């Protein structure tokens, strides 16, 4: 029994880190492709209109022919939305890594942190394999699945909706009737699933990202990252000890965001029901609650695996399952000037 217990209690193989590629050489810094430990977070706190990215305005200032702003450009300036601007800067992870995980269905059940009738949210902390390749702080991907025709809003002969709740709870006979009704409808009208329309997918992403970044910044996620970055840049301060922190700190003694503070990392939303004008308010509330749920996670409790090898948290177990050689081959094929390494931890 003692030997068996020892076998189960194993230490992680090492921390996953990104290092310069030994095969692909480039003068471009990592920050052009992925975030680094010193990458600043996205924030709503210090935005100015000059940050709006209206390149036409900047070009006109230097162009004698187009020295005055057109009425259209003035209108764009007046209608500039700083929240949508920052939301537009939210990125996910580099596509080869996203494909590697999605196609291989390499999701840990521990990453699923929030479920609603609209979507599921998977959250991956910053030291998770996927977060190593995120393109913004925080990172977010909004995906949709082809679950319901017309968002489940299909009338039966009694003018009752075959909505998503009814579908999920239907017995075999009723489900057969629902499927028949939907098949007849979709045979007449192609592309009856919202996720098949590119403009609806774009609109969905903007809705999620706009609501997400407002709540994430409201919960001080940007301040926590900035605090850690500043401490990490200071040669005389060890981020692991965090002694002498400011009175209002958003980090604990291990340099992690405190409970109630929005977290850095990678957020993956998988949406089943697209919000229309009748349900947009409820949808936004659910997005807010999902961000709050992650912010309120206790790190030790969240990282403890539901089952698995003793001595490792679920992120370490997932990282240990990654074939580094395979990942580096994928990165090389896609011409990324960096590769994945395992950095041995002390102790």
Swiss-Prot record:
Main location: mitochondrion
Subcellular location: Mitochondrion matrix
Single biological process term from Gene Ontology: mitochondrial tRNA 5'-end processing
Coiled coil: none
Any single Gene Ontology cellular-component annotation: matrix side of mitochondrial inner membrane
Effect of gene knockout: Mutants are deficient in mitochondrial protein synthesis.
Alphabetical keyword list: Mitochondrion
Additional facts recorded: Present with 721 molecules/cell in log phase SD medium.
Protein name: Protein PET130
Organism: Saccharomyces cerevisiae (strain ATCC 204508 / S288c)
């Amino acid at each position: 029994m003692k030997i068996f217990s020892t076998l189960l209690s194993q230490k992680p193989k090492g921390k996953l880190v990104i290092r310069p590629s030994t095969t692909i050489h480039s003068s471009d810094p990592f920050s052009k492709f992925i975030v680094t430990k010193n990458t600043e977070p996205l924030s709503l706190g210090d935005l100015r209109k000059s940050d709006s990215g209206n390149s036409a305005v900047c070009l006109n200032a230097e162009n004698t022919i187009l020295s005055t702003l057109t009425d259209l450009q003035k209108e764009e300036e007046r209608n500039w939305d700083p929240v949508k601007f920052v939301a537009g800067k939210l990125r996910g992870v580099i596509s080869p890594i996203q494909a590697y995980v999605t196609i291989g269905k390499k999701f840990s059940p521990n990453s699923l942190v929030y479920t609603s009738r609209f979507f599921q949210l998977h959250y991956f902390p910053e030291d998770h394999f996927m977060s190593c390749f995120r393109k913004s702080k925080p990172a977010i991907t909004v995906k949709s699945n082809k679950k319901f025709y017309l968002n489940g809003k299909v009338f039966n002969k009694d003018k009752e909706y075959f909505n998503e709740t009814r579908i999920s709870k239907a017995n075999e006979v009723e489900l057969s009737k629902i499927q028949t009704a939907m098949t007849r409808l979709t045979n007449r009208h192609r592309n009856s699933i919202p996720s098949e329309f590119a403009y609806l997918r774009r609109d969905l992403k903007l809705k999620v990202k706009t609501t997400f970044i407002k709540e994430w910044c409201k919960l001080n996620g940007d301040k926590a990252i900035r605090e850690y970055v500043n401490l990490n840049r200071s040669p005389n301060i060890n981020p692991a000890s965090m002694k002498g922190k400011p009175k209002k700190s958003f980090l604990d003694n291990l340099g992690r965001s405190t409970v109630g503070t929005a977290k850095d990392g990678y957020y993956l939303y998988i949406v089943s029901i697209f919000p229309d004008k009748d349900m947009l308010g409820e949808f936004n509330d659910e997005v807010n609650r999902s961000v709050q749920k992650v912010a309120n996670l206790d790190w030790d409790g969240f990282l403890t695996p539901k089952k698995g090898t003793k001595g490792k948290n679920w992120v370490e177990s997932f990282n240990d399952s990654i074939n580094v050689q395979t990942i580096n081959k994928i990165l090389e094929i896609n011409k990324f000037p960096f590769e994945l390494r395992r950095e041995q931890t002390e102790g």
